[in-house]
Amino acid sequence: MKKSGFTFIFVSGALDELPDSGITEVMGTEETIQPSSRNETEPTLFAVPASDPQEPPPPGQPRLRRAERQQVVMQVASLDSLLPEDHRARVVWQYVQGLDLSKLYSQVRAVAGGAGRDATDPKILMALWLYATLEGVGSARQLAKLCADHVAYRWICGGVSVNYHTLSDFRTAHPALLDELLTHSVAALMHEGLVTLQRVAQDGMRVRASAGASSFRRRASLEQCQQEADQQVQALRQELEEDPGTSTRRRQAARQRAAQERSERVMKALGELAQIESKKTVEKKKKARASTTDPQARVMKMADGGFRPAHNVQFATDTASQVITGVAVVNAGSDEGQMPPMVQQHQDRYGKSPQEVLVDGGFAQLQDIDKVSSPAVGTTVYAPLQKPRKEGRDPYQPLPGDIATIAAWRRRMGTPEAKEIYKQRAATAECVNAISRNRGLRQFLVRGLEKVRTVALWFAIAHNLMRAVALRAPAALAVVGG
């Protein structure tokens, strides 16, 4: 991949058919126009006040530079010269250049001396998705189009063509590697003293699933769908075996794969339905439904008060640096029970648990607070208390049946220091959630918890990349200034 070689461009035709970065300067023709005959006192199209009617017009006809799109243009340029030195795409590429992607290179089957076309460099695909995530691009088709039209994406590609199938497959094909990258990137910041895990804020955000409300069906309907899907697969298989035409066989094979995938999704939906029914009471089991599109999605109450198919994305963020330190995705509609797994995730990733964790009332379950605050874990919980049922009772005074960890939590939350510390929760967790939404984390375009979590990891790594740049900037300036 070369970004610095000179390219000679000789163009004849319409300039508006070229990419944005294809032309740097265009000569136009000078024409004269007749003054407008409309009333000069009328407001102009863009609300610019008209000339003073008493002011005499300048002598001669006005001269304007008019657009000329049929002019032949020659340009000598390189991709590297088209991208500013301080562009964010360069930051992303520099980060990817320092990653250990040996696991991806070991999976490349195209080798020197062997048959087949060359594989796309994994660094290009990694950089494309990181930069696209920062720019709010979540569609593989849209990203593939940008790789042909937009100078920043073209610079990352460096002349390598990338199709949307390759981009789509790469995005969800390596969840273990992305998980490892998150751990290593945060560990590097911890080694530099930029992240301490002294205080971590956790929050969940409900993100729309790639499924419609009409895809949720009850058991009887799912069983009927399963039967119809199996029959369709058998019919297409028989049709494929009987038709000798190559092109027709190719189309029929695609139809058979689609039918087989639908049959598998319906089967998964039946399995998920059994789990849903096991959590419901007897009278509510008949109302249990599962999606045939994304069986692992659940109908959740969204921020606007509506109910839609969604996944619950959990981010844990270091309050001092706003670096995402933990990622989890569940299909539970509430945040109950999500604090202990996240604390354990930090122990598994970094060999230490957060000293303090800040959560909202949805996480404040007594058994979870006790588990996290136990001497074996040693994490201090800051979470709001529920309003007491008995009027006039001080909520910060321990109840007679409280164990030591719960009593300490109640007393702690009544202190001015705890109330001041808890203010950091919204400033950290809510801020990271808002940034993720601004970058496009509003609806998933993939299905299944594993793929959804993989996409969430892309957001976390991209976010941490920019936070690392900001955190290291003062040290870099000190070195330059010193």
Model-predicted regions and their roles:
Residues 2, 8-49, 54-60, 65-66, ...:
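Anion-binding and metal-coordination hotspots
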Residues 78, 86-87, 91, 121, ...:
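Secondary-structure junction/capping motif
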Residues 99-103, 150, 154, 439:
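A short secondary-structure junction motif
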Residues 78, 124-130, 166, 184:
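A general alpha-helix detector
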Residues 83-130, 135:
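Basic, short loop/linker segments at the boundary and entry of helix-turn-helix/winged-helix-like folds
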Residues 79-83, 419-420:
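Short, charged, low-complexity loops and linkers
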Residues 78-81, 100, 218:
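Short, solvent-exposed coil/turn linker segments
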Residues 65-74, 82-86:
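N- or domain-start disorder-to-order transition segments that initiate the globular core
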